[in-house]
Structures are given as structure tokens and as C-alpha cells.
Amino acid sequence: MNRHASILILLLAGHAIGSVQAADRDAYEADALPFFKEHCLRCHDDTQQKGEFRLDTLARDFGTQQSAERWAEVLFRINSGEMPPKTEPQPTTAEIGKVTEWISSQSREGEATRMARRGPVAHYRLSREEYAQTVYDLLGVHFDPSMPGALNDDPRWRGFDRIGSVLTLSPSHVERYFRAAETILQQAYPATPTPSTVNRQTAVAPDRWLIYPSRLHGGIQAPVPGLYRIRVQLSALPSFKGRLPRLSLWNNSLKRAEVGQDILASEDQPTVVEFQTFLPQGGFQLINEAPGKLDDGPAVGNTPTTVRRLQDYRPSPTGYKLLLEDGRPIFPLLLVDWYECEGPIVLEADLKKRESFFPPELNADPPADPQKLDKRLRDSRESLSRFMASAWRRPPATEEVDRLMRLIEAERAAGENLRSAYLAAMAAVLTSHHYCYLVEGSAIQPREQVNDWELASRLSYFLWNSMPDDELFAQASRGNLHQSDVLQRQFQRLLNDPKSRRFTESFPRQWLQLHRVGQFPPDPERYPDYDKWLERSMVLESTGFFHEVFARNTSIREFLRSDWTVMNARLAMHYGKEFPPAAGFHRVPLIDTDHRGGVLTQASVLSLTSDGTRHRPVHRGVWVSEAIFGRTPPPPPPNVEPLEPTPSNKLKATIRDQIQAHTTHATCAACHQKIDSLGLAFDNYDAIGRWRTTEKVSGGLGDDPTVYAGGSFPDGRTYDGPDQFKKLLTEDLDRFAESFIEQLATYALRRAMTIDDAPHIRAIAAASKQDDYRFRTLIQNFVASPRFRQR
């Protein structure tokens, strides 16, 4: 053993293990080296290489792919219990925990290093969301990248869909970019514009249309993709349990609701609801988006389509019952007087964007006079150059403009008119990597800092998810955007612009991994109250809560614990709260017995960490570890057996009890000790985020068991339930702040953070602490940091 230890220590000092920073070396020698000496080197050194695996010469450079893969195999063998073999002395739970944590932390750091490794020029492909927002800000065209055949889905890394090294380009992407460019330009510059019309449908007075849950009514046509205004006069008849009907516009082709609103207006006081929204080409209908089967009553059957007053309705002996004996509706119903559709609408601001890039004379017949034709070509060059500068977010080089003018000439030589040839050049601009990518750096003059044009894009895509506007372009052209005072003024301007709402919707979706909400739809037998509008409302609560913290510039402490939230009528019903005074989301106060506040106890987070049938404490613990503390736990061992239902001949047991029985094995307990305490605190919430005091258990004997949501942190602090847990989290605000800044930087810089970023993150946190970690102050300190201007 001494000989092996001497060899290993010698290699540590030399090439095989590699030179590392002092902190890593200390952690290695304290946590990993003793484990390897005791349990590994007898079979995996210079004298034996069982399984053709040698550990003593395995490089500790996790930044290389080959080394990282070998270390991943080591972690896999330890986690799976394969190593050390059962015939050898077995490590303790604590020893396994230390070595797996060291390998996992080094693997994460190595992954981040590989992802962040860049050459003299870095290319960051726009996400689908950014592509669509840029199209709108450039040309005033609403392009839906989620439409069938539009753009490919973006891969995610830990929830983020804008990480440069992950957003690769395939032939499929290229093909779809060309199709998208053609679609966008057809909408921006149609050969024959479609006139705007108003079409109204009215019920024959005094009758009104009655729309039942999950039922469609009427017909609305969008002849071309565009902006439309839908107006409906209607009223609501809530169910006897208080559930409100929801008016939505149903897309017949895509089978989805495009826009909608809860309706509160009483039967005798109808209201006019207006939606102004982009619609793809096709047919639409009004729908009452309340579910067709509720616990309020039985499923909806055949019913009348018109009625004057619901109280006057008397069904035939074979008719369908709509009212209880006391006159209250069984179902949430809509009463519609009329509806109308106006469009397509072209806003003046959108038209102005397009006109600046397209010479109007291109719509006329080509002039016979060569001099007039030359002038038209010169005008086309100027317009095209402006378009390239805006689309590529930098001034184009003369040779780049020349290249596209040659394309125009080639198109004309092939028989196309000047208008078509010019549109072909515009399509080339939109399919260029200069448009589809954010390009930083120079192959000719390598540099560590982004230039002013790149800085303008970095700032605008951070806060607006889109291209810089004219003022930001102007500052970049003057070359003074790097000046701290100029950058801060522009930062404040962008922050206060309505387009910053894109940031407050996009960042929390990625940070909190809200894309996972609804991935495992709840079992309708167990959760009959769950519906798609509740699912969307869950996400909207989280993004709306985030925006409220942003808008009021309160402390990020509110993300952990608050005495308020935002909710609409659907969530109020879900949470057992009074309905807000009007439709939509509103800030509402919370009291202790609500057991809400902050993001951790929002239904979105609680449901995304469940599996559709029951809550998953381990998943919830992993989520808290990643989203709140910025630490991804080691992967679970392979072939982990799922928790079995309680046998019919045994007492009902909570999932907590089953997990504790499962974690008696050392390879399981090592990780569960750190994860479980972060997830079991939320056992009072079921799979869709409802509060409960007993856990409903299928099978088994006896009553459903009482929920116990107490526990302790790894440092020994104890809590009794989610409210105390969140209170303890606020005591770790410094730690959360650094994790939050890391998430923010990952989003803004489009890459994983490395150990080199840690001092900058700590400095930003320290500066922000002086203002109690107020949100806008924190973002301002991040933008002012050297890291924001570095490549």
C-alpha cells in the first residue's frame, strides 16, 4: 500500500494528475485521495489494470473530453455500487459522499471550462425566441417559430436555451432558416396587400349564445397571417363552486387556444372584451376553456345553443340539466351577445420599420431610361446597406454590400424583376450567419473585450431578447458605449423600456425551468380539478411574480420568502383564496395560513418537480439545489428501483417513509443526506401544488397518514415545515445571491460559468449587498462589472 501511495503522490506533483489550484488540491487530498488509496489502487495501478482501467495515471484535467469521460466512469462505478467489489472492504456513507462530491464538482467545472473555451471569434446562435423578437423589431412582422415546420426546437442546458456551445447548426436548421426568411419577407412586403375588414356576428335579440365548457362557437377567419383585433360582448355564469368560465380564441388547425381571459361580468351587466393579437392564417372559434368534465358536476351533454335568461330556461324531461334546484349553474357558462374581428391591421410603427429598408419605386414597373434605372439601383444599394446594418447589428463592409448587389444582378440576369431580385438579397441577409448568430471577436485582431457593436448586442439581447434600437446603434457608432457612464445610461434606458418585459418573462422561465410544467400531465382521476388554463396560470404566476420584483426593485430575498404573490381567479380558486377584483393577474397579500410566498411554494415549481401522479421529494430537492444554491447533485446510481405502492396488507406509508427506507444503502444515503432535506420540506404540497395535511396513499391499511415536513440542513439547523424552511433560506441570502448572479450571468453571457468567473460573481454580490440585494441594483452591478465587457 505504501508503494502505491508513493507512486500516486509522485504523480500528483507531476504531469499525470496535473497542476491544480490550491483549493482543488486540498479538497482532493482530503476527500478523494484517501478513498482511492484505500479502495481503488490495489486493482487499478501500474501493476494491475482490472477492466483495462488505470486510475493512478488518470489526469485530473477535467477540461478535456477524454479525461472527463473516464472520471464519469469512475463516478458511475462508485454510485452503482460496483466499485469497490463486494468482496473488498466497503467505504462508509461519508466516504462515498466526499469522493462523489469531489468528482461531480470537478466534472461540472470541467464541463463549464469546455463550454466556455472559445477561439478568437465566438458565434452564439439566436434562440427561437430571440429570432422571432428580432424579426419583429427589425421588420414589424410577427413570426411564430413554434408553428409546424417553422424553426427547430432549441436544446437546453440546465434550463437555459441560449447557451452558445449547445445551440449548434444542422442542415435542417439551414433549410428552415431559408423558409422562414421567405415567409417573413412575404408578410413584410406582400405583392398585393390584403385590405383590413371588420366582420361582426350578432345573436338574434333577445336571445344570446350559450357556450358550455370546452365547447366551440362561431367562426372567425384570418385570410393572411397578421395582427387582428377581436371584440366580444358577453357575460359569465360561474358554477355553483365558483369556477369562472374563460373565453379563449381556439385555433382550429393547431388545436390550441391563442389568447383568452377569465370572465367575471354578471348576466345582467355584460362586458366587452378585446384582444389584439397576431393570428396565423386559418380559422378560429370562440371557446369556453373551462374543462368539459369537472368535479362540479357530470360531463356536459346535449344542450341548447341560445337562451334569453338562464333562469328562464326549463329543460324538457329528456333535456340536459344546467341548474341546481336553487338556480345556480352546475357548470361555468358564457353568454355571448356578439363578436367581431377586424384585420389584418398594420400598425404605423411597423410600417415605418419596413419602408426604411425597401425603396417604394421597386413596386413600380422598371424605367426604360438607363439613368433612372441606375438611380433605382443606387437607391436599392443604400436601402440594402441600411437593412444589412440593422439585421447584422453592425455596419457592413463595402465588399459585403457589393456581394449582395452582385446577387441582385444575377437574379435580374436570370429573368427576375428588380423587386424580386432585391427581396432575394434581403433573404440572403436574413439567412446569413451574421443575422442568425451573435458574432464576437476578430480573427484578424484577437481581443479579450467585445467592441462597441458587440456590447450593444450583448446588452439588448440580455434585457430585450432582441437587437439594439437606433439609439443604442448610435452610441456604438460613436465608439463610446464602453464608457461606464454611457453604458449605465443606456442600461437604465433599456431597463425602463416596455421591451424589458421580455427579460422578465424569458429569464425566469429558464432559471426556474418552467418549460417542465405540464411535461407529465397529472392523472385526471386523481386531480380532476387540473386543466390547461390552470397549467398556464401556474407559469404566469411565476413570471408575473418575477416581473413584480423587477418593477418594484425589491430585494431578491422575495424570491425565497414574501408576504404577497400575483394570481388570477383560476389560481385563487386553486389556492383557496378570494378572487381578485378584476380579470387578469393582480398582486395579492398573503397570510401565514396561506403557506405561500416566494417561488418555492408556487404551484409551477411544485408541479414541475412531480410526476403527474404524486409529489417527488427527491426531484424537489434537486431543483432547490440547482435553482437556489447553484449546485447540481451527482447523478443517481443506474437502475434505481422505483418506490413501490404500499402493499394491501401493510399500513399506509408516506413517500417520505419509503424514501428513508430506500436510503439505508450507503451508495444511496450519501447523496440523499444532502438532497432530501431540501425536498421533504415541501411534503405539505401535492403533485399540483395544493396544500394538504394528510397524504393520500393508494392501497394499504388504515387512514391516510399525516404529513410531516420537518427536517434539518446539512449544517444542523432544523425546520418544521416549508415556512420555517424558507425563513432559514433567507439567512443564507449571501449564498443565494451568488447563485442567482451566476444564473443571471449564464443567461446574459450565453455560456457556463467557470471557476475564473467566481471572483467576479463574489464582487458583484458584495457590491449588491450594500443595497440589500435590490434586483435592479444587482443587475446594474453585473452590467458594470468587467466580466460583462469581456469575451
What are these regions (language model features)?
Residues 8, 19, 94:
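Alpha-helical and His/Cys-centered functional microenvironments
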Residues 18-24:
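Boundary at the C-terminal end of the N-terminal hydrophobic targeting segment
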Residues 1-4:
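N-terminal secretory signal peptides that target proteins for export/translocation
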Residues 63:
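Glycine-rich, highly charged phosphate/nucleotide-binding loops
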Residues 56-59, 84:
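Residue-level detector of conserved, well-ordered beta-strand and adjacent loop positions
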Residues 25-51, 66-73, 78-82, 86, ...:
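Low-complexity, glycine/serine/threonine/alanine-rich intrinsically disordered linker
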Residues 6-16:
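Bacterial N-terminal signal peptides
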